[in-house]
Amino acid sequence: MSKYKKLFKNAKFWDQKLAVIFVVPLSKTGITPNQITFITLILAIFAGYLFALGDQNSLNYGAAIFVIARFMDNFDGMIARIKNMETKFGYFFDYTTGGISFAVMYLGIGYGLQDSTLSFWAIVLGIAGAISSLACLNIIFR
């Protein structure tokens, strides 16, 4: 069984199966799993910035970019397995950027919604969400 068919068969969720379609051509390029992880982090930070702007268009674009970033998070591990590039650093980097991505999203949404009916509580909830995302990293790496 080819590596690609095995990836597709082992994919548990629909987004992982869909990701295989993108991973196959990407795996034939020089891009590394850690580069993909870094790209997803940059996209998530940009999405957080858009969330922080708070207007409807920015919130919508921020949401779309964040979904794309999280979808692309499937790519790095798959490419690492295909290219036999799995490392402890890559595993740590992937999980850390995932936690940071969610923290930035919560902070951005909280800041962006401070002028809504939530007012001050939007920021409090954003900070609470960010702290919980980062706390999960602490639990994972114990």
Question: Predicted regions span which residues?
Answer:
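A feature for the membrane-embedded catalytic helix bundles of lipid/isoprenoid biosynthetic enzymes
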Residues: 1-23, 95-142
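Topogenic membrane-insertion module of multi-pass membrane proteins
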Residues: 1-61
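Juxtamembrane/transmembrane-helix boundary motifs in multi-pass membrane proteins
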Residues: 28, 53-57, 86, 90, ...
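Hydrophobic alpha-helical transmembrane segments
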Residues: 38, 60-64, 123-127
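Residue-level recognition of pore/gate-forming positions within transmembrane alpha-helices
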Residues: 41-44, 70, 130
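Juxtamembrane membrane-interface segments at transmembrane alpha-helix termini
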Residues: 52-54, 73-81, 134-142
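Acidic (Asp/Glu-rich) catalytic motifs at the cytosolic membrane interface
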Residues: 57-110
